[in-house]
């Protein structure tokens, strides 16, 4: 089966062509047109600008994906498109384009949930697929949640953030300490410098950082976003607000502070919160596989820490490659395949939705 997938939920216009056979998925092409440079001028995504950019890019991106895959539309057996959640104007561009393409060429159409797509990015690696039931977490600029994946199309939310997403908090604090939007990669590097400075070692385990004098420095205290109420939930707004107040105090008092050590402390609290809740989730649900996906899954400190948690719990960890952690269409095609074989085809009346309807 040859699959054409389209993604336009936020600030990347993406198209991909996948093939699926008895050996699994093959990504024949994956094209992403990023709007980062445009939105960087505003410090974040401007929805109207994003929608207009999608309109300008979607046809060319799809054509390039088909050309690189060396296929024509007559070779395509299935069209998949992100239909929710996301920016409504951005989603509508992809949905309407995919609907027109599918209808004009009499190809079945499947609507895909963006978060299910992120988790499906883990199905595109070389390792065996995680077998349901398994535990998955989606960590991005808009989502922070744990899911019990009962089948490749049936998900149950078992933990979530009650306010801000982990990626949004990194972007906000990153901007305040001079890291350009999106802050993820820059924050990762700066925190790495801070961890090395605090421990005297490159890529030191976070357990070593916790023993350092830098961690014991009370002037850099930040609270954990892991809620201590027996749930698998988070509150990243508390961590973010505490960090903002700390930065304001430094500024008002004319105090110098080490940006790298600050980034390390913030990263430590965010990563350890995810690790703590992952440990709790794995003890609560008897699974053999764990998937970590979404843009924040590219964070090197988080990847290493969750690998430690998975190893200790005796479960297999599946993390998409770095190129598939961010928004892309290949992941949408992978999830779309499973929706299709489950009989979840979309009608011509398909509409986009900004709301998250993963369950």
Where do the language-model regions lie?
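Short beta-strand scaffold segments in enzyme catalytic cores
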Residues: 13-19, 136-138, 144-148
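N-terminal beta-alpha supersecondary unit
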Residues: 2-85, 114
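Short Gly/Thr/Asp-enriched flexible loops that form oxyanion-binding sites at enzyme active sites
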Residues: 81-105, 300-308
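Glycine-rich phosphate-binding/hydrolytic loop that grips phosphoryl groups
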Residues: 118-120, 320-358
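A contiguous, well-structured pocket-lining segment that forms one wall/lid of small-molecule binding clefts
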Residues: 189-196, 209-210, 214-290, 300-313, ...
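Conserved phosphate-binding/catalytic loops in two-lobed NTP-binding clefts
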Residues: 111-112, 290, 307-332
């Amino acid at each position: 089966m040859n699959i054409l997938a389209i993604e336009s939920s936020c600030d990347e216009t993406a198209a991909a062509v996948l093939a699926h056979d008895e050996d699994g998925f093959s990504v024949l092409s994956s094209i992403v047109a990023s709007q980062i440079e445009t939105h960087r001028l505003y410090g974040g995504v401007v929805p109207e600008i994003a929608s207009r950019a999608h309109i300008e890019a979607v046809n060319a991106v799809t054509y390039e994906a088909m050309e690189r895959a060396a296929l024509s539309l007559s070779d395509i057996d299935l069209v998949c498109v992100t239909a929710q959640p996301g920016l409504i104007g951005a989603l509508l561009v992809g949905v309407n384009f995919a609907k027109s393409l599918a209808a004009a060429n009499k190809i079945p159409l499947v609507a895909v949930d963006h978060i299910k797509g992120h988790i499906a990015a883990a199905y595109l690696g070389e390792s065996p697929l995680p077998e349901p039931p398994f535990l998955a977490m989606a960590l991005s600029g808009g989502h922070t949640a744990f899911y019990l994946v009962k089948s490749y199309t049936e998900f149950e939310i078992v933990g979530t953030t009650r306010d801000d997403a982990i990626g949004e908090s990194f972007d906000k604090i990153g901007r305040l300490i001079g890291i350009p939007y999106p802050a993820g990669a820059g924050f990762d590097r700066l925190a790495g410098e801070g961890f090395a400075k605090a421990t005297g070692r490159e890529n030191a385990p976070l357990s070593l950082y916790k023993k350092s004098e830098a961690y014991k420095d009370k002037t850099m205290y930040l609270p954990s976003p892991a809620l201590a109420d027996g749930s698998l939930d988070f509150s990243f707004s508390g961590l973010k607000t505490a960090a903002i107040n700390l930065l304001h105090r430094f500024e008002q008092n004319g105090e110098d502070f080490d940006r790298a050590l600050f980034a390390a402390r913030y990263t430590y609290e965010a990563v350890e919160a995810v690790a703590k809740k992952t440990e709790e989730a794995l003890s609560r649900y008897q699974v053999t596989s764990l998937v970590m996906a979404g843009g924040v899954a590219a964070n090197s400190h988080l990847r290493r820490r969750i690998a430690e948690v998975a190893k200790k719990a005796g479960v297999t960890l599946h993390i998409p490659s770095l190129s598939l952690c961010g928004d892309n269409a290949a992941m949408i095609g992978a999830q779309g395949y499973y929706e299709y074989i489950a009989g979840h085809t979309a009608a011509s009346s398909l509409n986009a939705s900004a709301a998250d309807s993963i369950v």
